[in-house]
A protein has these predicted regions:
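Catalytic Walker B motif of ABC-type/P-loop ATPase nucleotide-binding domains
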Residues: 1, 236-239
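H-loop/switch region of ABC-family ATPase nucleotide-binding domains
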Residues: 27-28, 271-272
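Conserved beta-strand-loop-alpha-helix hinge in the C-terminal portion
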Residues: 47-69, 291-313
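Helix-to-loop junction immediately C-terminal to a conserved catalytic motif
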Residues: 138
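Conserved ABC ATPase "signature" region
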Residues: 192-207
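Walker B catalytic motif
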Residues: 211, 240-241
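Conserved ABC ATPase signature
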Residues: 211-215, 219
Length: 314
């Protein structure tokens, strides 16, 4: 959910409480619940480990919350680090126009320059055209005739199918093998030690022989991300990759994105996750109504802009 939809959800929860209803929320992101909670039940390994009153839960320090793998109650307290990168080149997108109906374009971009070897956060409200841009960039939309130039070489739609790899928002469409390990091996038969290393870094090694569809939602997301990491593609596109992840696993994904960036690959991350953005992203691309609103590097000034977008809009 974007910030506006999160506000609507918070408003509805408040109404339900006023009506005397009991509301149980299984959640990793806690900031929007800060003023609503009456009780916090902390589960670990299938057991109730802690049971807090609202007052006691809100007294937990940022360090204590992090040790428990909890997202912070206060986004402003989350540590931020600038990750600007001097790009060695750019990825040029031209004539990216697309519409799902005969009405106005869902995507309306004449030209767009993306920094190579960056981790680019693609932000915007629901319906802004973020996922459409991702699908067009990856060559998944036949009616988008745009061209992408990388290192001076043009790639048409079909050629981009082997240039890019996309982790979709609903990863159930992408998990089709009999085991987690086979899912990664299907990406060009990478070396077994590489498969194990990636699974280990994403806390999935113990599930290597498990069927992907038997995993939890967050584990499935991490399997799809692991598959992208071993794909060997130059451009990775991830659509809401941390929506179901706790703090620890979000940080593991952030670390992997930084590693990819250091390898000279480019990642586009469609996200409403402020903590992920300030943990690893180097640039921001802001879309609304299918049009680019702004682009900026996440240097000190850029961090202030992204904080304003997420925190001041709460």
């Amino acid at each position: 959910l974007d910030m506006s939809a999160t506000k609507d959800l918070r408003r509805m929860i408040r109404i339900w409480k006023q009506q005397g209803k009991t509301v149980i929320i299984a959640e990793h992101r806690l900031y929007y619940l800060k003023e609503l909670i009456d009780r916090v039940v902390y589960l670990k390994d299938g057991r109730i480990e802690k049971d807090y009153s609202a007052l006691d839960a809100l007294k937990l320090s940022v360090t204590q919350q992090a040790e428990m793998g909890l997202r912070p109650f206060d986004l402003g307290a989350f540590p931020v680090t600038a990750h600007p990168v001097a790009s060695s080149g750019s990825i040029e997108c031209e004539n990216f126009h697309f519409a799902y109906t005969k009405q106005r374009d869902t995507l309306d971009i004449d030209s767009l320059s993306l920094p190579q070897a960056g981790v680019i956060a693609v932000i915007g409200h629901n319906g802004a055209g973020k996922s459409t841009l991702a699908r067009c960039l990856c060559g998944l939309e036949k009616h988008c005739k745009g061209i992408v130039n990388v290192d001076g070489k043009p790639y048409n739609r079909k050629q981009r199918l082997s240039l890019c790899y996309m982790v979709m928002q609903d990863v159930n469409h992408q998990l089709f093998t009999e085991s987690t390990e086979e899912m990664l091996i299907s990406m060009g038969e990478p070396a077994p030690d590489k498969v194990d290393a990636v699974l280990d870094r994403l806390d999935l090694l113990r599930f290597k022989n498990r069927h992907p569809m038997a995993l939890s939602g967050g584990q499935k997301q991490r399997v799809a991300i692991a598959t992208a990491l071993v794909s060997g593609r130059k451009i990775l596109v991830l659509d809401e990759p941390t929506s179901g992840l706790d703090l620890q696993h979000m940080k593991e994904v952030a670390d992997e994105l930084i590693t990819i960036q250091e390898m000279g690959k480019t990642s586009l991350v469609i996200t409403h996750d402020y903590e992920l953005i300030v943990s690893c992203c180097t640039h921001v691309l802001h879309l609304e109504h299918g049009v680019v609103q702004e682009q900026y590097a996440l240097d000190a000034a850029g961090l202030q802009r992204i904080q304003n977008f997420f925190i001041e809009s709460r």
